């Protein structure tokens, strides 16, 4: 007996017409079924057919690479192939199609992507993959390449990435690379890419209002470095470059001691005119300065990058490897990659997008080793050793060089000073200080390097003396003394003023703070910290001076406090480090993208 047929789907019993949506409840309609795996399964089968060379109707050829494929698949995924196979071009009927603009391996990767939606972008292939994806109009691949390059932005490569993005019409990447270069200007100008820029590109960069710089001297020194890189050819551009350096914004001392003495300025009448303009600006009363409006008197208005404070190693109570960061925006601490080995009493700087931990004590020996930390990769790497072993040294960056100042080598305090050139990965000695100084604090203001206080092992005294180093003359000169002896003082620079924070004189641990103004060659007292600290880290960020950890003479401190010069008050940060640390290295970095 035959089974009677079922009534047609979605019809009333005994009726053959579909339901009228106007008459019936929509909820009774049959749902539309969508199988999310259907397309994926179909492409998987098509890729299997391709790998077996089944049903393929075209062979794509690049160099000596032959790639069987299906026209309909290529045309469906690539507008380039769609135009080729659906138009009147000879390739629409050809069994073999040669692509001359792309190498074989890259084309194979892109055809694989068409079938699988999978691709791996690396440092090695991105420069050929992106233009090839652009040619085949595979916009998703091009976007992936741009996102990869954006994640790789670094002071040493951002100018090259910017040029690459410009060449291949990657507008978003171009803008981001340009912004990155502006925000990291002080480190970018130390790169080979900057030194190899053309004059138009240099002028475009240094004329930007968005440069993130601590002082206009960064721009002046960048110009001098660029010209000296190929002096015979480039010195004719000095006047054109100096037009974009905002000399009136520089301190008078820097104008007289550095700019006026620069041979490249002396040899250009136009440059001397810019210098005279700047000097006149400084001679005017404040009210009249406001009326002297020009591009060179306009303050730059950079976009503020989010900052992190990095605290490296330290004594807790023995030398440790731990590294932690404080996020100012999120107001919290987090751990990052540890040091390769234990280290305390080290010098610490941020230069060329890297954090450098210089010398120090590993728990048994004073060391001359140096490690650099890449915040983007969260990775430490060893660089060239110093010439001398140093702990309790001072470290600072001046004119693109890292200086290691004084310290203790295990037997005696040091007056020697050495500098590190990141480009050659080499250390070399410069003029020694006039006094041996261990537990010395250092800072850079107005193109001069200051060594503050410390301990003189020869006289067995904590020091109140201060001396400054002029790199052009390669000499150290005493300046005004502090009001008190300070060894292990934290030293920081804020608003072109030099701060000496805490420290000790023998058993007495201080909470007092004094500040030095280079324009008056005088120290003055400001508000005391909330607690006594010596061997603490100091850094300036967002107009505030932060003091981190240290010890109070009896225990290591995990607390942090900051000084506001506007209110002359210290405030304790609510969030503490995970452990108390003294002799830790502290610096501020740009938060990685």
Curated annotation (Swiss-Prot):
According to UniProt, this protein's pathway is: Protein modification; protein ubiquitination
List every stretch annotated Disordered: 1-29
Q: Which domain of life is it from?
A: Eukaryota
Alphabetized PROSITE patterns for the sequence: BTB
Q: Which GO terms describe its molecular function?
A: actin binding; protein homodimerization activity; ubiquitin-like ligase-substrate adaptor activity
InterPro entries in UniProt: BACK (IPR011705), BTB-kelch_protein (IPR017096), BTB/POZ_dom (IPR000210), Kelch-typ_b-propeller (IPR015915), Kelch_1 (IPR006652), KLHL2_BTB/POZ (IPR044072), SKP1/BTB/POZ_sf (IPR011333)
Per UniProt, the ranges with Basic and acidic residues bias are 17-29
* Gene3D superfamilies recorded: 1.25.40.420, Kelch-type beta propeller (2.120.10.80), Potassium Channel Kv1.1, Chain A (3.30.710.10)
What SUPFAM superfamilies does the entry give?
Kelch motif, POZ domain
Principal location listed in the UniProt entry: cytoplasm
Task: Give the Kelch repeat ranges.
Answer: 308-353, 354-400, 402-447, 449-496, 497-543, 545-591
**Domain BTB per the UniProt entry, residue ranges:** 56-123
Query: What GO terms describe the biological role, i.e. biological process, of this protein?
Result: protein ubiquitination
Q: How does it assemble?
A: Component of the BCR(KLHL2) E3 ubiquitin ligase complex, at least composed of CUL3 and KLHL2 and RBX1. Binds actin. Interacts with KLHL12. Interacts (via N-terminus) with FYN (via SH3 domain).
Name of the molecule in the record: Kelch-like protein 2
Q: Cite the source lineage.
A: Eukaryota, Metazoa, Chordata, Craniata, Vertebrata
Q: Which gene encodes it?
A: Klhl2
